[in-house]
Amino acid sequence: MDFKAIAQQTAQEVLGYNRDTSGWKVVKTSKKITVSSKASRKFHGNLYRVEGIIPESPAKLSDFLYQTGDRITWDKSLQVYNMVHRIDSDTFICHTITQSFAVGSISPRDFIDLVYIKRYEGNMNIISSKSVDFPEYPPSSNYIRGYNHPCGFVCSPMEENPAYSKLVMFVQTEMRGKLSPSIIEKTMPSNLVNFILNAKDGIKAHRTPSRRGFHHNSHS
């Protein structure tokens, strides 16, 4: 399997979502974060778009989102986030296990995702992810194996203040199992808002002087 080609194609799809301005319906706004959705073309579910402002430069924000080491210290939606295969300095495969949601009505899922960071002109960075088959990590009876259709983060500088970033996140997750779509549609917008808030808190915590290894981890 040509993982690098898949990664590059996924980044291109995320860039396309970012340029697509038609058909989005706002489903939640909270604390200056906006969640919109439209029908996914990949599966019978929604593609979500989440927008917020992060008080950090795009370069530092994208490094923060790309690194694996500290992810579960701030991302409260995950219980496991491990790199399982490094392809090159910009591309790796990770195994994640989510927490349960909706007071336990959505049980934990696990995912095997191909993650890729691509840097564009104008200080815009895209971190894309897409589920792949990876024989070393077959589905387990302990968790339902979910599937992420092309997802990602787009980090770009704010025109009026380049030290701040506009973060746009795209999510289209196929939970699988026996969930009704209505449960997912009710819980997903709040979970996405919480992710942005958790990321803001995580970045704040990383601004303390004890940042040794921060950049090293993103390329280890």
Swiss-Prot record:
CDD domains the UniProt entry points to: START_STARD6-like
Function comment: May be involved in the intracellular transport of sterols or other lipids. May bind cholesterol or other sterols.
Entry keyword annotation includes Transport: yes
Domain START: start-end pairs: 1-208
Protein name: StAR-related lipid transfer protein 6
Keywords: Lipid transport, Lipid-binding, Transport
Lineage per the UniProt record: Eukaryota, Metazoa, Chordata, Craniata, Vertebrata
Stored PANTHER family: PROTEIN CBG07384, STAR-RELATED LIPID TRANSFER PROTEIN 6
GO MF annotation, one: lipid binding
SMART domains (UniProt xref): START
Pfam family, one: START
Domain of life where this protein originates: Eukaryota
A GO biological-process term: lipid transport
